Amino acid sequence: MSAGGEHLKDEGTRRQVVLSGGIAGLVSRFCVAPLDVVKIRLQLQIHSLSDPASHRDVVGPIYKGTLSTMRAIIKQEGITGLWKGNIPAELMYVCYGALQFTAYRTTTQVLAQLDPHRLPPALESFVSGAVAGGLATASTYPLDLLRTRFAAQGTERIYTSLLASVQDIARNEGPAGFFRGCSAAVGQIVPYMGLFFATYESLRPVLSGLENMPFGSGDAAAGVIASVLAKTGVFPLDLVRKRLQVQGPTRTLYVHRNIPEYRGVFSTIAMIVRTQGVRGLYRGLTVSLIKAAPASAITMWTYERSLKLLHDFRVAE
């Protein structure tokens, strides 16, 4: 394996990078699926937790915190409720991981050919991460929307299967229905992935040489720190994306029946601030950060190990 911050940029064949990215996404998604469902439920909840009067006309559950939300889902929907939306999510994560790492590798190789006008390493990582994140997000967005809608279902099922959900959305909402909130997603993921990769590439060479690192290795620790910092900065757009994804004819049928009607990213932000305050933009942030740390650590660790395994296997042939 190569040293320093170049390890993600130039190692492995295209096939190895695609396969390693797909494996990393698959493993990561399955491990953090319960936290993802909890996060989505909290993000879609609009009533105040500190004002009991706002609970008077609420139809559906009232979630308070990560652990209590998890317990409520298990009690009302069974343990499998924590993996709702896992099929479209697994498909999304595999495709996303493969596209993301491939685009990142390709972009950095293109930027490396700009000599003698090559960008500084940190800026190069930022641009590559932004391009990779934007492309992967837009390409897999319909699966992201399906994941959210399945996770938002309570005991009453709106969609009975993945195929049925695709047919229903296509019939009742048209092609645009699969891209509700896509602008918020791209607006969120471009700076997120740019910041994530720039931080990760900067930290990994430093942390990889240290012993007794938390999370098991320098790769994982760098992934955790990079993810937490980037996630906090763009979280309001993530919440807006979730609220927009459940708009349409099924808006009042999810586990939270009182989801307002939102139109557009900026009007959604304004409405949330007006009715719920600035804190309303950060609902679910705690569980999001709890999820982001292991998810990114698992993703980067699995990617690095998968790539090394495939590389060693090829050399041994």
Curated annotation (Swiss-Prot):
Query: Per the record, GO CC terms?
Result: mitochondrial inner membrane
Q: Which PROSITE patterns match?
A: SOLCAR
Q: How does it sit in the membrane?
A: Multi-pass membrane protein
Q: Where is the signal peptide?
A: none
- Transmembrane regions: 17-35, 91-107, 126-146, 181-198, 220-240, 284-301
Give a short account of what the protein does.
Answer: Mitochondrial transporter that mediates uptake of thiamine pyrophosphate (ThPP) into mitochondria.
Query: What keywords does the record list, in alphabetical order?
Result: Membrane, Mitochondrion, Mitochondrion inner membrane, Repeat, Transmembrane, Transmembrane helix, Transport
For this chain, the family text in UniProt reads: Belongs to the mitochondrial carrier (TC 2.A.29) family.
Subcellular locations according to the entry? Mitochondrion inner membrane
Q: What is this protein called?
A: Mitochondrial thiamine pyrophosphate carrier 1
MF (Gene Ontology): transmembrane transporter activity
Residue stretches of each Solcar repeat: 12-110, 120-206, 214-309
